[in-house]
């Protein structure tokens, strides 16, 4: 939408998974989702600042942030490359307990994934129809036209990357809670999958 290739996706996905896992292990499975999304916003903000304020090429900015996030993720995970969540209460275990004895028993993974996808789609449908959402879309199509319309393309780029990375981190958080573990390489190849899906 912004006509920007964000190569920090791999690191951001792992960042969301790591932050979500750490918060979930501390006993807050729902708060972990919000924390992971906020971590993604931070990652997107740094990437956007490198591109817009420091004049770094979008590809290089993504590579820089992705590389930096490796060290950040190790620090978040307490210096370990793996977090085991086998005895941790997650949104998936809570949903599993709630669905016990119902026809949906054993379908908690699909159900939570479906809920997450629906919520994201609903948010984007409404957000992209707002004034800010339309400005973000216009920035990707023609930044010169946006400038002539007295819209700040720097601001719209920052917001766009923050929103995109928050959803990337959300995906990482949900995957970590689903498989009950986080590995430092959990996000490897995510940017390839994202580009292929486009």
Language model region names:
Residues 1-29, 33, 49-55:
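Single transmembrane alpha-helix segments in multi-pass membrane proteins
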Residues 7-15, 55-65, 135, 185-190:
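Cytoplasmic-side transmembrane-helix entry/capping segments in multi-pass membrane proteins
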Residues 28-67:
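Alpha-helical transmembrane segments within multi-pass membrane transporters and channels
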């Amino acid at each position: 939408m912004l006509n920007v290739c964000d190569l920090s996706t791999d690191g951001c996905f792992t960042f969301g998974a790591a932050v979500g896992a750490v918060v979930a292990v501390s006993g807050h499975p729902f708060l972990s989702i919000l924390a992971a999304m906020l971590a993604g916003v931070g990652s997107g903000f740094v990437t956007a600042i490198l591109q817009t304020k420091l004049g770094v090429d979008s590809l290089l900015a993504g590579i820089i942030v992705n590389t930096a996030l490796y060290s950040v993720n190790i620090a978040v995970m307490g210096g370990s490359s793996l977090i085991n969540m086998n005895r941790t209460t997650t949104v998936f275990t809570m949903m599993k307990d709630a669905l016990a004895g119902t026809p949906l028993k054993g379908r908690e993974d699909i159900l939570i994934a479906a809920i997450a996808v629906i919520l994201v789609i609903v948010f984007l449908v409404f957000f992209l129809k707002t004034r800010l959402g339309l400005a973000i879309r216009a920035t990707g199509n023609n930044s010169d036209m946006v400038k002539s319309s007295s819209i700040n393309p720097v601001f719209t780029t920052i917001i766009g990357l923050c929103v995109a990375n928050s959803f990337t981190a959300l995906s990482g958080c949900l995957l970590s809670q689903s498989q009950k573990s986080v590995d430092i390489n959990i996000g490897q190849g995510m940017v390839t999958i994202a580009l292929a899906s486009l």
